[in-house]
Every structure is written in C-alpha cells, then in structure tokens.
C-alpha cells in the first residue's frame, strides 16, 4: 500500500560532480574503489570504505571561480599606481574601505598595533575569499562552497595553523609547550594537558560549524519556501511563498557579509589570544627576575 505522505530525498552528503570532469578515486586499500551495485545504481564506495574521492566537484569549481573573481577585482580596482594615494571610483573606494576595516578593526584591535599588521594579508584573504564564495552561492545555478563541511573545515584548519604559529613565534616553543600545562603542579599535567589540547581544537571546530550551519540553513529555508509552490500546486501558495523567499534572499545577502566578517573576526581574536599568551609568558619570564635586583637596590638605598 502506498504511503499517503510525500517523500523527498535530499542527498546532502553525496558529492556533486561538476560537468563531465574525470573522477579520481584513490584506494586506501586494495580493491576499495571498485564500483558496486546499490539500490540507486552503480556507486563508488566512500571514505569509510577505504576509497578517497579526489574528483572535481561543483564546490571545487566554485572555489576556483571565487579565487579568479577575487584576483580580477583586485587587479581592476586595486591601486597599482603608488603615486596616487586617493582611490578613484566607487569600486576602488569600497575596496579600500573594506581593507582598512579589516586592518584597523580586526587585525590591529584584536592582535595589537605591533603584531596586527603581520597578519593582515591572511585576514584579508579569508574575509574576501569567504565573501566571494558566499555571494556566488546566491547566483542561480551556482553552489555555495561554504555550505560544504569540508570547505569550512579546511578554512578553519588554516586559521588553526596560523594561530599556533603565532603562539610559538610569540612565546617560543618552550613557552608554548609550557602554556599547555596551565601553570599547575607537574602531578596535574596528565589532567591539564589533555584539557588544554582539547581547548585548542574547539576553536577551529566552532569556526567550521558556525560558517557551515549558517550558510546551509539559509539556503534550505529559501528552497523550502520555493518548493512549497510545486509541492502544493496551488497558485495561492505562490502569493505567500515568493515574498517570503525574496525576504530570505535579501537576508542571505546580508548573512553572506556577516559570516565573512565573523570568520575573519574570530580568526583575528584567536590569533590575538595566542600572541597575548606569548607576551604574558615573556612578562613572567623577564620582568620578575629584573624586579629582584631593583628591589635589593631599593633596600640598600633605604639603609
């Protein structure tokens, strides 16, 4: 007996291969990538079965396209003439405004005036790359690369690596490892070190899930509202769904900017925390030994 309910299958986890690019599968064990028949036809096993899929997907193409558009934007509106300090044109002014915002409000404010400029190129790259990928996802027949968990995880991994490098550079390898002990007695290290290491990975995990969930959720709501028109098949539904879908579309444009800003801001905040950890270690490692002789000289002068 047929079910009275309408069943809709949305394969969110399956890769979407773009155009007719050749597929590339790397077997992690012998015979792992051999095609097999399923209820949906012939399929290639996944990573859990020992087959690594390195094929070009639609999200991969979107990342390439975002990078090309970003480079073209910088080439067209970037001020290549060093003698002209004032940008000309609306595009150049908007670009300069965003660059100065990332430098002053994100890098310098969260990392510091001395160390902040060092990380401005990374923060600018993250901000504009995510922004362009988000905006491409709003174009019909395109895909939102930031709605892919693997993409957001890779971006968060970049921030994680930069954050750890910043901490090691500021505190030194010894100071960085000492920070993992939390400054507690050695007999508490077996408890404190795993907690600190877990804390290191919660930050990139939060970056991954925040960007992924926000970009995916908005598009699901948007397509659900439009899908109601075809599911219910009544003209009156369109009068309600279309205005709501348009409102969600405008909201998604705003969210595209906000999520790029939030990711860059949190990246700057995490880098600033690592740099501050190094300065805190230097203060405790150098200021206190110098206080001893000064204190002794003060007592001798008083005597």
UniProtKB/Swiss-Prot annotation:
The chain crosses the membrane at residues 59-79, 122-142, 148-168, 181-201, 220-240, 244-264. PROSITE patterns: ATPASE_A. Residues 281-290 have a biased composition (Basic and acidic residues). It is a multi-pass membrane protein. Its main location: membrane. GO terms for cellular component: plasma membrane; proton-transporting ATP synthase complex. It comes from the Bacteria. F-type ATPases have 2 components, CF(1) - the catalytic core - and CF(0) - the membrane proton channel. CF(1) has five subunits: alpha(3), beta(3), gamma(1), delta(1), epsilon(1). CF(0) has three main subunits: a(1), b(2) and c(9-12). The alpha and beta chains form an alternating ring which encloses part of the gamma chain. CF(1) is attached to CF(0) by a central stalk formed by the gamma and epsilon chains, while a peripheral stalk is formed by the delta and b chains. HAMAP family: ATP_synth_a_bact. This is ATP synthase subunit a. It comes from Myxococcus xanthus (strain DK1622). The lineage of its organism: Bacteria, Pseudomonadati, Myxococcota, Myxococcia, Myxococcales. The gene is atpB.
């Amino acid at each position: 007996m047929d079910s009275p309910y309408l069943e809709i299958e949305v394969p969110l986890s399956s890769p979407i291969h773009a155009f007719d690019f050749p597929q590339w599968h790397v077997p992690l064990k012998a015979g792992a990538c051999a095609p097999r028949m399923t209820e949906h036809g012939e399929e290639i096993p996944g990573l859990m079965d020992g087959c690594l899929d390195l094929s070009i997907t639609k999200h991969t193409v979107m990342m390439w396209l975002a990078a090309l558009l970003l480079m073209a934007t910088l080439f067209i509106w970037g001020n290549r003439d060093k003698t002209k300090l004032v940008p000309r044109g609306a595009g150049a002014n908007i670009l300069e405004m965003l660059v100065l915002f990332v430098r002053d409000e994100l890098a310098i404010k969260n990392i510091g005036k001395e160390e902040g400029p060092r990380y401005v190129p990374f923060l600018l790259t993250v901000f504009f790359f995510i922004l362009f990928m988000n905006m491409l996802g709003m174009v019909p027949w395109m895909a939102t690369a930031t709605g892919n968990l693997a993409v957001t995880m890779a971006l968060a991994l970049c921030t994680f690596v930069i954050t750890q490098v910043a901490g090691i550079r500021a505190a030194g390898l010894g100071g960085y490892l000492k920070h993992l002990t939390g400054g507690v007695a050695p007999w508490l290290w077996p408890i404190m070190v795993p907690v600190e290491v877990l804390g290191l990975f919660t930050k990139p995990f939060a970056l991954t899930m925040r960007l992924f969930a926000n970009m995916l959720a908005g598009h699901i709501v948007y397509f659900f509202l439009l899908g109601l028109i075809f599911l219910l098949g009544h003209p009156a539904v369109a009068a309600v769904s279309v205005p709501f879908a348009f409102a969600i579309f405008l909201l998604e444009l705003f969210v595209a900017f906000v999520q790029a800003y939030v990711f860059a801001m949190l990246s700057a905040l995490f880098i600033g925390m690592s740099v501050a950890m190094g300065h805190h270690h230097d203060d405790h490692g150098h200021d206190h030994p110098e206080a001893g002789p000064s204190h002794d000289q003060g007592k001798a002068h008083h005597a």
